[in-house]
A protein has these predicted regions:
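His/Asp/Glu-rich acidic catalytic environments and adjacent acidic regulatory segments
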Residues: 3-33, 80, 89-298, 317, ...
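Short, hydrophobic/amphipathic alpha-helical patches that form generic packing surfaces
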Residues: 66-77, 140, 242, 343-349, ...
């Protein structure tokens, strides 16, 4: 492979990806080489004459598929952060080939028999716990990949996987295209009353970039949401809300000027039909059972009961929140009826009146250099590492690169940081692995992470400033990054986040969010963008008082998403009379107190479950929040003794029992090793201001 690595940067695995040199035309030739090598390795490993041993089977497959995963990971990453028509075409062309390869591995009966033989052999007893876990996971995944299906059913099962991958990609493309296509230009500055200065400035720059006068607003979140939250012009809020809520739907052309072919309605129905068929082929009653097989939660019923319990506890708080908001809007804002495009605006006004501060005021205290320094200080203090700037080729001039070292200077990991929203970059925030930790003979391959956000870029020569929510997002994604980077596991299949149950994956990310509510952390990491002053204690106290503002409504919103997702995959019939849009409305009516707009088509942009791997898994956020809140409570308990939540002894224990072990043991075992007991919901309720009243 090294010979062609000179000419094709995607085939060079000697170091970090050569981002400056990778071109769309490299994708297909690289995958030709890698898929060929991986297929041959699978053939060798599954051959009758190959001994059923770890080295001859598992290692052979792993060593050939890891480069494939890394190269395809780079292509997928670039497709998400630097989308061009050429790259999108190269990705789309090769996605079916990669899907087909993994499908064929998952269904390879001869390979499955080899894995079963290793698990039944004398060698199994001598394997490390990590290797046993990899084997056990593999056997489970083989079953879920259709390895036990009769031969004549396998082509159809493979077809299902390929069709689902293609539909996911189309869903995602449609959301991106519909979001990118919309622009609303305001020509009269008076219409912008209420908007923060930086939002107005960003809109002016966006219009200038197009060679236009006025202020350009888009459906990208940093442009769209300030309008919803601050604009006094109700018609402007409504215009943008309608465009946002109907993206990628049959109403898109009417409200957002999108194209009819970006409508995701049929894609959603098709995905649900295919998932249902897949579940039936595997002998499950529904797709939710398939989704939960590798997760912590034991059954759809357990998840539904968990969500129902949380909904019941949150409902009285949500009722109170909604009543307060409606009363305030009628009395103070002259809004007799709260329309959906009024909710964020009224909530922001009530929050400002009640707590006398705005998100925008807080934002000035978190310029990017201070926020990053704060994040790194927390990490260094708790986990005994050092974070330093480093050098590597990047895909955009705004991307930075860092290294994580132990105190003795030895390299632990590296990461890319891509913080700003821009054209051709998928919305949202995420962590992805560029390379996983693994031992190769006596050499350790250190992990590398991609950390991606979509914050507003710097304007007017000043550093970017982050809202408190954005600071929380930064800590959240870095928590995922730490899970990936601080692992001590040497086996690729269970190092870092590999092999971690999906509903436990959010534990380390949501755990980190808690530090964003601590006075000593925030005061030390704040520095006003103009004066350098630290966040005033008085402002912090207001933020804390406002922390659980409308947390009842926020909790019910998440329950609507989670319950919609779970019930959609338990007993919803995609071929039945009730469409997905109507079903979403039913769920909203059942669990939420805020009515849904008749034109809202939010399922059509629910990328988590239709393009992001969260199908029958969205509940994981709340499930993991129970774990993360309870884990954080250990630091609160330590602070009662030591005076600070930045308690190094507890941090060391957390690093050892949660972060370092990665996926090498069940998440429940890791949690119990850290906490000394099973998780309890009390800390979550307390952190959300919904602790049950004392009896």
């Amino acid at each position: 492979m090294s010979a062609s690595a000179n000419t094709n940067p995607l085939l060079d695995f000697s170091g970090l990806p050569r981002f400056g040199e990778i071109r769309p035309e490299h994708v297909t030739p690289a995958l030709d080489t890698l898929l060929d090598a991986a297929s041959r390795a699978v053939e060798t490993a599954s051959a009758q004459e190959t001994p059923s041993t770890w080295a001859a089977v598992v290692e052979t497959v792993e060593q050939a598929t890891e480069p494939l995963g890394r190269a395809w990971g780079i292509v997928g990453h670039l497709n998400a952060v630097a989308d061009t028509p050429e790259l999108r075409a190269a990705y789309g062309e090769n996605l079916p080939r990669v899907t087909e390869f993994w499908s064929s591995v998952g269904q390879n009966l001869a390979l499955y028999e080899k894995y079963k033989a290793i698990a039944a052999s004398a060698e199994y007893a001598t394997l490390s716990a990590e290797r046993k876990k990899i084997l056990d996971n593999a056997l489970r995944d083989f079953r879920l990949s259709g390895a036990e299906l009769p031969e004549e059913q396998k082509p159809r099962f493979a077809e299902l996987q390929e069709q689902q991958a293609a539909l996911s990609k189309a869903f995602s493309d449609h959301v991106l295209d519909a979001t990118n296509a919309y622009a609303y230009v305001v020509e009269d500055e008076a219409e912008l009353a209420g908007l923060p200065g930086d939002a107005i400035e960003a809109a002016r720059e966006a219009a200038q970039k197009d060679g236009k006068a006025g202020w350009k607003f888009t459906l990208h979140f940093p442009s769209y949401f300030p309008v919803l939250q601050y604009a006094e012009n109700r018609a402007l809020r409504e215009t943008l809300y309608r465009a946002y809520a109907t993206r990628a739907s049959e109403l898109g052309p009417q409200y957002g000027g999108g194209k009819a072919e970006w409508d995701n309605t049929a894609i959603v129905a098709d995905e649900l039909k295919l998932r249902r068929e897949e579940a039936q082929m595997l002998g499950y009653r529904n797709f939710a059972e398939v989704s939960l097989a590798p997760k912590m939660a034991e059954s759809p019923q357990q998840v539904i009961a968990f969500l129902e319990d949380l909904a019941t506890r949150a409902r009285p708080h949500a009722d109170k929140d909604w009543d307060e908001l409606r009363t305030f809007a009628a009395k103070e804002l002259g809004l007799a009826e709260l329309a959906p495009w009024d909710v964020a605006y009224a909530a922001e006004k009530l929050r400002q009146q009640r707590y006398a501060f705005s998100e925008n005021e807080v934002k000035q205290y978190f310029p990017e250099p201070a926020a990053l320094k704060g994040l790194f200080t927390v990490t260094e203090t708790l986990f005994g590492v050092r974070i330093k700037p480093d050098e590597a080729p990047v895909w955009h001039k705004d991307v930075r690169f860092f290294r994580v070292e132990n105190r003795d200077g030895s390299l632990v990991a590296q990461f890319y940081l891509d913080l700003y929203a821009r054209e051709g970059k998928r919305g949202g925030a995420w962590m992805d692995d560029a390379r996983s930790r693994a031992k190769r003979g006596s050499d350790v391959q250190t992990p590398v992470a991609y950390l991606t956000c979509n914050f507003s870029a710097p304007i007017g020569g000043k550093p970017a400033c982050f809202t408190h929510d954005e600071v929380i997002t930064l800590f959240h994604e870095f928590g995922h990054g730490l899970h990936h980077m601080l692992t001590r596991v040497d086996e690729l299949g269970v190092s870092g986040i590999n092999g971690v149950e999906w509903d436990a994956v959010e534990l380390p990310s949501q755990f980190m969010e808690n530090f964003c509510w601590e006075w000593d952390v925030l005061s030390s990491m704040s520095s006003h963008v103009d004066t350098g002053a630290a966040l005033p204690r008085e402002l912090f106290d207001k933020m804390i008082a406002a922390k659980n503002f409308q947390s009842g409504l926020g909790t019910l919103r998440q329950i609507v998403f989670s319950m919609f997702d779970m019930l959609l995959h338990v007993d919803f019939d995609p071929a039945g009379a009730t469409g997905v849009t109507a079903f979403a409305r039913e769920i909203n009516e059942r669990y939420h107190v805020i009515p849904q707009a008749a034109f809202s088509r939010w399922p059509n942009t629910f990328s988590h479950i239709f393009a992001g791997g969260y199908a029958a898994g969205y509940y994981s956020y709340k499930w993991a929040e129970v774990l993360s809140a309870d884990a954080y409570a250990a630091f609160e308990e330590a602070a009662a003794q030591s005076g600070s939540v930045l308690d190094a002894a507890t941090g060391t224990r957390y690093r050892r029992e949660i972060l370092e072990v990665g996926g090498s043991r069940p998440a429940m075992d890791s949690f119990k090793a850290f906490r000394g007991r099973e998780p309890e919901i009390d800390a979550l309720l307390r952190h959300n201001g919904m602790a049950a009243p004392a009896h």
